[in-house]
Structure formats: C-alpha cells, structure tokens
C-alpha cells in the first residue's frame, strides 16, 4: 500500500512538472507575440523627446486630452482696442463698470469695456491610419547649415537610390523637425521603415537619421467652448476723432490709473475705424 501511494505521488509530481514547463512555454510564446512589431505596426516608431511640464497629485482625475502649442485667433472689430494687463484682478474690476469715460483735451470719450471671449477646443477625436507610401525622416541635429530646399534635395537623392534601399520619390515636405517623403512604390516605404536607421551625408558629415511610418490623421469630432481671456479686455465704441498712435497713448494712460479701476498695462493695440484686426493668443506655458 505504501509503495502504491509513493508511485502515485511520484506520477503526480511528474505531471505537475510537465504542466509547469508547458505553462512557461505558453507564457513565453505570448510575450513574443505581444512584443512583436507585427502585432501593431510592423515598423519602428520615431523617437520624440517629451518634457513633463504639469503637476502630479493623488486623487485627481487624469486629463483626457493634451493640447500643445495652443494658438487662438480672435478678430478685432474696427473702432476697438485690445488691452492686456499683468494682473487679472484689473480685468475683473474694469468689467464691473461697462462704460468708461476717457478724458481728452476738449471732450470725453464714452467707450464700452467688455470681456474677450476666446474659442477653446476642449475635446477632439482624431482617426489615424498609416500611409503605406510615405515615411517620416527624423533625427536631424541642430545647427545644420542647409536651407530647407537643400535638405529636401539631399534626402530625395539619397533615398531615391536603390542601393540605399530607396526608390522613386514622388512627394516631399518639411515638417516641424522632420521630413515626410512619399514613394511611388509602397514596398520601398515599408522596406525603409523596416531598416529604421540610415547614415546620410549632410553638411559634410554622416548623420544618423531614423525612418518610421507616416501616420495621417483626420479630425472626426471637436468640441469648442468659449473662455474669457483672464488678462485682457476689449474696448469698443471708439469714435474716429484722432490718429491711432495718439489714441493709443491716451487709452494706456487712462487704463493704468488705479482710480479708474486700471493697473499696469502689458500691451495695448488700437484698431482704427475702417480697419480690421486679428489678435493671436497663446497658452501661458508655451
């Protein structure tokens, strides 16, 4: 009876070891398939430097989107002025009194002060897909003494040669820090991406460049809301009674006086009658 139990126990131990080995094999196979470039896009991804400029706090909701280098264009009507203050509290004080009287030598100007509402994208959905005929070339060092046209010419010549793995270049475009190249044969683009890195002669030196897939995107949905500019107000209803420079100085003096509810003016732009203006706002962190 004891021998039988030992035999059964030994058989169970062997079966357990065999199953454990099989499990390890399956886990290794899963890791290989998951880590394989072919599981997603069969090419290398361009190396893009990222810099964290935000805050980390526990218990806070993670943002669903990030907007980089935000620029908002705001049209300015004729007979108006855009006034920007260093302290946003000045804006709050001025908006409590919509009509302001600006003293001139012989009369007073009655102008309207109103908040500046800016359209801001709060959510955006973009569909993206690889372009099989195009590649993205990156890794250009700073200080290259080549014009944009010279750089594009040299890249077209290099990647247009079959000995370099290239082919007929149909399109080329300079992007921000990168170059897009489009080829007539999609197999050429795929082959270049599979190689990934090339030493290209540029500006009397061999530069190691990276080639990765070009992904095109299309905006499917965008949500926009209007947000008040915290540091600026729009002054309207300005009559055509003097030249723009003189009016600029008078308005700056008026809105710098604390007795008028004003404060330190950071910038002031006047749009005379018969003209149109365009103000471009950027994020404070950019």
UniProtKB/Swiss-Prot annotation:
Main location: cytoplasm
Assembly mode: Homodimer. Also interacts with B-ATF. Interacts with TRIM21. Interacts (via NID domains) with NMI (via NID domains); the interaction is direct and is facilitated by TRIM21.
Family: Belongs to the NMI family.
Descriptive protein name: Interferon-induced 35 kDa protein homolog
Reported function: Acts as a signaling pathway regulator involved in innate immune system response. In response to interferon IFN-alpha, associates in a complex with transcriptional regulator NMI to regulate immune response; the complex formation prevents proteasome-mediated degradation of IFI35 and correlates with IFI35 dephosphorylation. In complex with NMI, inhibits virus-triggered type I interferon/IFN-beta production.
GO molecular function, one term: identical protein binding
Disruption phenotype: Knockout mice show decreased inflammatory response when exposed to infection or injury, which can lead to lower inflammation-induced mortality.
Domain of life: Eukaryota
PTM info: Phosphorylated. Dephosphorylation correlates with the formation of a complex with NMI.
Gene3D superfamilies from the UniProt entry: 3.30.70.330
Segments forming domain NID: 81-170, 183-266
GO biological process, one term: negative regulation of non-canonical NF-kappaB signal transduction
Region (Leucine-zipper) residue spans: 5-26
Keyword annotations of the record: Cytoplasm, Immunity, Innate immunity, Nucleus, Phosphoprotein, Secreted
């Amino acid at each position: 009876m004891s021998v039988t139990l030992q035999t059964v126990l030994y058989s169970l131990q062997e079966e357990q070891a065999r199953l454990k080995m099989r499990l390890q094999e399956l886990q290794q196979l899963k890791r290989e398939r998951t880590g394989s470039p072919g599981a997603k896009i069969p090419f290398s991804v361009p190396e893009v430097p990222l810099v964290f400029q935000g805050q980390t706090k526990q218990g806070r909701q993670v943002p669903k989107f990030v907007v980089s280098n935000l620029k908002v264009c705001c049209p300015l009507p004729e007979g108006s002025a855009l006034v920007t203050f260093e302290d946003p509290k000045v804006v709050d004080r001025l908006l409590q009194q919509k009509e302001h009287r600006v003293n001139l030598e012989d009369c007073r100007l009655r102008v309207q002060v109103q908040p500046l509402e800016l359209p801001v994208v709060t959510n955006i959905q973009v569909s993206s897909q690889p372009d099989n005929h195009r590649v993205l070339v990156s890794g250009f060092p700073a200080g290259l003494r080549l014009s944009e046209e010279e750089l594009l010419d040299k890249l077209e010549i290099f990647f247009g040669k079959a000995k370099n793995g290239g082919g007929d270049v149909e399109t080329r475009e300079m992007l921000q820090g990168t170059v897009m190249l489009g080829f007539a044969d999609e197999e050429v683009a795929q082959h270049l991406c599979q190689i990934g890195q090339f030493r290209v002669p540029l500006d009397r030196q061999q530069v190691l460049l990276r080639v990765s897939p070009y992904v095109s995107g299309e905006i499917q949905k965008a949500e926009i809301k209007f947000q008040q500019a915290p540091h600026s107000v729009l002054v309207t209803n300005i009559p055509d009674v003097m030249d723009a420079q003189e009016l600029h100085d008078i308005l700056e003096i008026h809105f710098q006086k604390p007795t008028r509810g004003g404060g330190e003016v950071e910038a002031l732009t006047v749009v005379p009658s018969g003209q149109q203006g365009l103000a471009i706002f950027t994020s404070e962190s950019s």
